[in-house]
Amino acid sequence: MDHSALLPTDTREIIEANCREATDNGYACICITPATLTWVMDYLRKTAHTSNVSAAIGFPHGTTTAEVKAYEAAQSCRMGANEIDMVMNINRAKNTDWDYVREEIQLVRQAMAAERQDALLKVIVETSLLTQEEKIKACETCIAAKADYIKTSTGFSQGGATVQDIRLFAGLADKRIKIKASGGIKTARQFLDMIEAGAQRVGTKFSLQILEGLTREYGIK
């Protein structure tokens, strides 16, 4: 479970409450914006808690340049993030400029590695905006660029993760890339559906609600 706190209205108090939830429940990471990253790192130092921290870059539309995304990623890693969730350049993807998309991901990957070799890169492709052919090409491009994860959605567009898209990516992955389902996942049943379809991680801001549902409805703790 990747727990997200990405709203532009999130105050420091809200971010710290989300950090507390993430550390108390052992989530895979907390995903925040670079602007709130200092609050997260301060909280973790102050409480002596540990958590993986992911910064969302080029968020939410992916429309900044490759160089800006690379700088954002490098700066976030310097500030303490050990994971990056970057938004693919959807304009370029829709224009079939897949070389640009691949090179952008590679540039971000290199910028991250210069700061910390162990950082994970997740690429958000915003599946609701892509055709089936574009989804396939996006997955192939993420694999070619050596991303660690392909991620379905930002949660800020017109649609979110679907079981069909997770199955599509799982069929293409062949152990070369992992899959993160994100966007619109609110219930225990949705969470289980995504995992069963092939996702290794699920991104949501409804993490505690899902955990409670897993225990109440399925006896999973």
Residue spans of the language-model regions?
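Metallocofactor- and cofactor-centric catalytic cores in central/energy metabolism, strongly enriched
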Residues: 28
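Short hydrophobic "strand-cap" motifs at the C-terminus of beta-strands
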Residues: 182
